A protein has these predicted regions:
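Peptidoglycan-targeting cell-wall enzymes and recognition modules
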Residues: 2-26, 52-143
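Low-complexity, Gly/Ser/Thr/Pro-rich intrinsically disordered linker/tail segments
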Residues: 167-200
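Extracellular/periplasmic catalytic domains that process cell-envelope and extracellular macromolecules
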Residues: 42-46, 96-99, 135-136, 158-161
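Short, mixed-charge amphipathic alpha-helical segments
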Residues: 37-42, 125-131, 156
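Acidic helix/loop microenvironments that form the catalytic cleft of cell-wall polysaccharide enzymes
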Residues: 54-57, 152-174
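N-terminal carbohydrate-binding/catalytic regions of secreted carbohydrate-active enzymes
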Residues: 16-48, 168
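Proteins synthesized as precursors that undergo proteolytic processing into mature forms
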Residues: 135-139, 146-155
Length: 200
């Protein structure tokens, strides 16, 4: 992995991921500093919004795999449900095989195929690769970029961050935690807070 200017230090990342042992945080530092550049998540407002979201989704880098019940929602990952069709799950067992993995959970055969093309790795044949720090990070940065979230992060307002959350989550689940993380990471990265809505 080529060396690029660091966007994050180890001390910053461990402070951001408070409660997570440093030995669990360290494997993510190099992939983050690389893929944040690759996907142009490379300014303090972009980094803050991205990290706040992935820290919420992954429990401060503790989890890279969806906890499987299966819950009633997860049972709908299996064909022939409408949700399974949307996820591209066509074969029995696809729901469990293609459960959410990565720092922003990639879910479903279709999305695994898409990220396989983007990252030149066969995650359909080897889905657990997305649990590894390198690919968990790369897939999250890919997801962020493909959903057009950098321009929203540039606004650096609460309303823009709310729109980012909706685009990632489909709603506002965990909003209070996502917002608290965003504000705290902004402070760690030295970003001044802006009004809730940008001035026209």
């Amino acid at each position: 992995m080529p060396e690029l200017p660091r966007l994050l230090t180890f001390d910053q990342l461990t402070e951001i991921c408070r409660g997570t042992p440093p030995r669990r945080v360290e494997p993510f530092l190099s992939p983050l500093n690389h893929y944040l550049h690759v996907y142009e998540i490379n300014t303090p407002p972009r980094v803050a919004a991205f990290l706040a979201q992935i820290c919420h989704e992954s429990g401060n880098l503790r989890w890279t795999r969806e906890i499987w019940g299966p819950t009633p929602q997860q049972a709908r990952y299996e064909p022939p449900s409408p949700l399974a069709r949307r996820l591209g799950n066509t074969e029995t067992g696809d729901g469990h095989n293609f459960l959410g993995r990565g720092l922003i959970q990639v879910t479903g055969r279709y999305n695994y195929a898409q990220v396989s093309v983007a990252l030149a790795q066969d995650f359909v044949a080897n889905p657990t690769l997305l649990e590894q720090p390198l690919w968990a990070t790369a897939s999250a940065c890919w997801f962020w970029s493909t959903r057009g979230l950098n321009p929203m992060a540039d606004e650096s307002t609460e309303d823009a961050y709310r729109r980012i959350t909706r685009r990632i989550n489909g709603g506002l689940n965990g909003w209070a935690d996502r917002l608290e993380k965003w504000r705290r990471i902004q402070a760690i990265l030295g970003i001044e807070s802006r009004p809730r809505v940008a001035k026209k």
